[in-house]
């Protein structure tokens, strides 16, 4: 496939990211290992960029990722929609309900306070995006027709 840069006026998106979006669970001021409740967010290095571009500069953005087709995946899609990022390029992967086929990634992050640094712990084994192949996404359409 030949990628030709086109004028912005011919492109649907200003920026598109490709990568894993995880459900981020934040124990607030507490520790992961002793928390009884968490605040949920979406997050992922590549996704955070397009969300920031959308929120800060009102750019048209999208994310290319894959989710297990279950309630957690739908929650993450909703978080992405709330961030203003287009979700139409998400690949929904069949799941068996127990994570053997695929699952959605989790990230636990403690906030840093004073001299205590932030602490993170990710649970990313067997995630939908890690099971995805290039054939799961129509890159000719994404980079050809959409720009």
Regions found by a protein language model. Give the residues of each.
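Active-site cofactor/substrate anionic-group-binding motifs, chiefly glycine-
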Residues: 40-43, 87
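A generic fold-level signal
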Residues: 10, 33, 44, 101-103
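Alpha-helix C-terminal capping segments
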Residues: 41, 48-60, 82
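A general structural signal for well-ordered alpha-helical segments in protein cores
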Residues: 15, 46-50, 73, 105
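Positively charged, low-complexity intrinsically disordered leader regions
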Residues: 1-37
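Gly/Ser/Thr-rich helix-start
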Residues: 20, 44-46
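Conserved N-terminal subdomain of the carbohydrate kinase-like
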Residues: 60-147
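Residue-level "hotspot" positions that anchor or transmit function at local structural transition points
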Residues: 34, 38-41, 64
């Amino acid at each position: 496939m030949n990628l030709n840069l086109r004028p912005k006026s011919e492109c649907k998106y200003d920026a598109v990211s490709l990568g894993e979006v995880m459900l981020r669970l934040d124990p607030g001021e507490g520790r992961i290992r002793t928390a009884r409740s968490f605040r949920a967010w979406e997050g992922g290095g590549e996704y955070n960029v397009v969300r920031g571009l959308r929120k800060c500069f009102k750019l048209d953005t999208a994310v290319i990722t894959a989710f297990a087709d279950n309630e957690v995946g739908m929650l993450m899609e909703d978080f992405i929609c709330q961030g203003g990022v287009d979700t139409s390029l998400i690949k929904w992967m069949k799941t068996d309900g127990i994570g053997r086929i695929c699952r959605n990634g989790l990230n636990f992050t403690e906030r840093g306070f004073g001299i205590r640094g932030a602490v993170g712990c990710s649970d990313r084994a067997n995630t939908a995006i890690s099971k995805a192949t290039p054939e799961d996404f129509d890159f000719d359409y994404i980079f050809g027709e959409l720009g």
